[in-house]
A protein has these predicted regions:
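Low-complexity, serine/threonine/proline-enriched polar segments
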Residues: 111, 115-131, 208-218, 223, ...
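A generic structural motif
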Residues: 161-163, 176-178, 264
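Conserved catalytic cores of phosphodiester-cleaving nucleases, focusing on short active-site segments
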Residues: 83, 173-197, 212-214, 220-224, ...
Length: 331
């Protein structure tokens, strides 16, 4: 049994999929961890870049905006398909779907780490052979990781919620590897360009139409916003902070220490250009090969607890100001 923080005794988290909104038992609205952290990244001036890039490419802003939207939608669909395959494999082979039937819930109730004592007795260690079969033997490196932790007495949870009721922050952990004395957190990423841990960009070959990415990396002196302005402005920094916020939430709920954080990048095996980079086709999109072989790269991450505490201090001030403002409306 886990010693669940008593602040979770009377509060549950709900997710309205149609409105994409998180609330709790008391109808408080939550901000997702992802949304919160993107407030610390310099804002992308879409209007400016549409005007600049459309002029460079000789196409209308409307057409370029649609190409950007198509790329985003394709990436989301591809990422969701990979995430769902891994999630279903874990939940099916660990009896998770049966276990959550023991939680009093309505249709919008999220299963969270605060429910661990209710469901843990019904969760079984993943049957690795079944998981490998379920995921079509595509991720040998993932199987090695899971085998190690299963052998050492851990249970593996997928897509499980976490939240901080006092700060109205929520999130969903891709992979929670849990034992009664410690835990680890993992996350799947499917970015076309991979993970970067420094600010910068790849130079483009503008002699081709459409322009093609080259393998020449151009570093930039670009950082996140205070109080994390010592971190480079790149997806690796945001993802590291995301995992670290989740780790703090799990510690808050269960009171046990973190034993590790990792990001697992799954490359979809795109058609490559002459520079070895994903090729952009005349339709403006990047195409996956007909018979793709997905490649897994694992990144061990630091627990940025100090940075998390600074971000949560900011959030605490926002919550306090909101409550003061709300009270003044009724004074």
């Amino acid at each position: 049994m886990y010693d669940i923080n008593p602040i979770y005794n009377d509060v549950r988290l709900y997710f309205n999929e149609a409105e994409h909104k998180y609330t709790d038992t008391f109808n408080n609205q939550y901000i997702s961890t992802t949304t919160l952290l993107h407030e610390y990244a310099p804002k992308f001036d879409k209007k400016y870049w549409l005007k600049k890039k459309s002029a460079e490419l000789g196409i209308s802003e409307k057409r370029l905006a649609q190409q950007w939207q198509d790329i985003t939608e394709e990436a989301c669909a591809r990422g969701t398909k990979i995430h769902n395959g891994l999630e279903d494999g874990i939940k099916t082979t660990s009896m998770f779907y049966d276990a959550i039937q023991h939680i009093p819930r309505n249709d919008n109730t999220m299963t969270t780490v605060a429910d661990i004592n209710t469901i843990d007795q019904y969760i079984k260690p993943i049957v690795l052979d079944e998981f490998i079969k379920f995921t079509e033997n595509k991720y040998p490196k993932v199987y090695e990781i899971f085998d190690y932790y299963i052998t050492n007495g851990y249970k593996i949870y997928s897509e499980i919620g976490v939240f901080l009721p006092n700060l109205l922050i929520s999130g969903t952990i891709d992979i929670l590897i849990l034992r009664e004395d410690r835990y680890l957190i993992g996350d799947w990423k499917t970015n076309r360009g991979g993970l970067k841990f420094e600010a910068g960009y790849y130079k483009k070959d503008r002699t081709q139409k459409p322009n093609q990415l080259t393998d020449v990396w151009v570093p930039k002196k670009d950082v996140l916003l205070p109080p994390v302005n010592h971190l480079p402005n790149c997806n690796g920094s945001i993802y590291n902070l995301q995992l670290s916020v989740y780790a703090f939430m799990v510690e808050t709920i269960l009171g046990i220490p973190n034993a590790g954080l990792w990001l697992c990048h799954i490359d979809s095996d795109f058609v490559l250009n002459e520079y070895g980079m994903p090729k952009r086709f005349p339709d403006g999109l990047y195409h996956v090969k007909k018979n793709p072989i997905e490649k897994v790269t694992l990144f061990k991450m630091k627990y940025l607890k100090k940075e998390v505490m600074n971000i949560l201090s900011d959030r605490r001030k926002v919550i306090a100001a909101t409550r003061i403002q709300s009270q003044s409306l009724f004074d």
